């Protein structure tokens, strides 16, 4: 009987992406950050979903709802700190991943690299909007300063800033739309990650020696699945 993972229409895609994928035999720990970013994204989406159940995007109650999460919700403090520190870990992995790409010349894979740049900007935008949500003093300052940068655009700058704010200052409308975008963007990022991987698997990954590895490839599983799991544990 033929193995179901090689014949089933859906499992076949997973098989070609994560199991039987031919991968260079010499990629180092620098190639672990892609899978770590995937783990970070999953943690952020899961913890964010639970936080969104208790958060209120209203200027009068936003800060109180964050306090309520930390004090009254079962393990709410843990979920919040996982989400906040998970975001920091996300960026550490992101900068390492980009740094490795620059050092080892991954920018030659144009489609993969360009989607990666879009992903970087999308993650930065998501993080910025998340920073505003607790509606403390620094949230208000951050929202005002960063959005005000757009006012430097000639002619349309002021109108653009007021359009983003939803009024003449950072207020309830700003907080509500920032929460809406902060909620939806991670799912858009997840979709972009799929496209990023699609383009990567079209060309194959590069390797530390910088030479074509077509003549020396090994299956992704079990070699790199175990390597990635070790990265998760570390």
Swiss-Prot record:
Transmembrane segments: 33-53, 77-98, 113-133, 178-198, 226-234
Record GO biological process: mitochondrial electron transport, ubiquinol to cytochrome c
InterPro entries in UniProt: Cyt_b/b6_C, Cyt_b/b6_N, Cytb/b6-like_sf, Cytochrome_b_N_euk/bac, Di-haem_cyt_TM
Other remarks in the entry: Heme 1 (or BL or b562) is low-potential and absorbs at about 562 nm, and heme 2 (or BH or b566) is high-potential and absorbs at about 566 nm.
Entry keyword Mitochondrion: yes
GO molecular function per UniProt: metal ion binding; ubiquinol-cytochrome-c reductase activity
GO-annotated cellular components: mitochondrial inner membrane
Localization annotation: Mitochondrion inner membrane
UniProt keyword Repeat present: no
Function: Component of the ubiquinol-cytochrome c reductase complex (complex III or cytochrome b-c1 complex) that is part of the mitochondrial respiratory chain. The b-c1 complex mediates electron transfer from ubiquinol to cytochrome c. Contributes to the generation of a proton gradient across the mitochondrial membrane that is then used for ATP synthesis.
Membrane topology according to the record: Multi-pass membrane protein
Gene3D superfamilies per UniProt: Cytochrome Bc1 Complex, Chain C
Record-listed heme b b566 binding positions: 97, 196
UniProt keyword list: Electron transport, Heme, Iron, Membrane, Metal-binding, Mitochondrion, Mitochondrion inner membrane, Respiratory chain, Transmembrane, Transmembrane helix, Transport, Ubiquinone
Protein name: Cytochrome b
Listed cofactors: heme b
Subunit-level organization: The cytochrome bc1 complex contains 11 subunits: 3 respiratory subunits (MT-CYB, CYC1 and UQCRFS1), 2 core proteins (UQCRC1 and UQCRC2) and 6 low-molecular weight proteins (UQCRH/QCR6, UQCRB/QCR7, UQCRQ/QCR8, UQCR10/QCR9, UQCR11/QCR10 and a cleavage product of UQCRFS1). This cytochrome bc1 complex then forms a dimer.
Cofactor remark from the record: Binds 2 heme b groups non-covalently.
Residues reported in the UniProt entry to bind heme b b562: 83, 182
Binding site for a ubiquinone: 201
Family: Belongs to the cytochrome b family.
């Amino acid at each position: 009987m033929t193995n179901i993972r090689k014949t089933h229409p859906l499992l076949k895609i997973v098989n070609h992406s994560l199991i039987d994928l031919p991968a260079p035999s010499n990629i180092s720990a620098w190639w672990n950050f892609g899978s770590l970013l995937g783990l970070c994204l999953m943690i952020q989406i899961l913890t964010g979903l639970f936080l969104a159940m208790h958060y209120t995007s209203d200027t009068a109650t936003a800060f109180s709802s964050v306090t309520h999460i930390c004090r009254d919700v079962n393990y709410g403090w843990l979920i919040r700190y996982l989400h906040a520190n998970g975001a920091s870990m996300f960026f550490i992995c992101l900068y390492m991943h980009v740094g490795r790409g620059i050092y080892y010349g991954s920018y030659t894979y144009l489609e993969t690299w360009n989607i990666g740049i879009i992903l970087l900007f999308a993650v930065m935008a998501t993080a910025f909007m998340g920073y505003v949500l607790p509606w403390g003093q620094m949230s208000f300052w951050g929202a005002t300063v960063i959005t005000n940068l757009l006012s430097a655009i000639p002619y349309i700058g002021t109108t653009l800033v007021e359009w983003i704010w939803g009024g003449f200052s950072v207020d309830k409308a700003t907080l509500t739309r920032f929460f809406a975008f902060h909620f939806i963007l991670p799912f858009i990022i997840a979709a972009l990650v799929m496209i990023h991987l699609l383009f990567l698997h079209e060309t194959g990954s590069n390797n530390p020696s910088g030479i074509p590895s077509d003549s020396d490839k090994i299956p992704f599983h079990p070699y790199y699945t175990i390597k990635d799991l070790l990265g998760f544990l570390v």
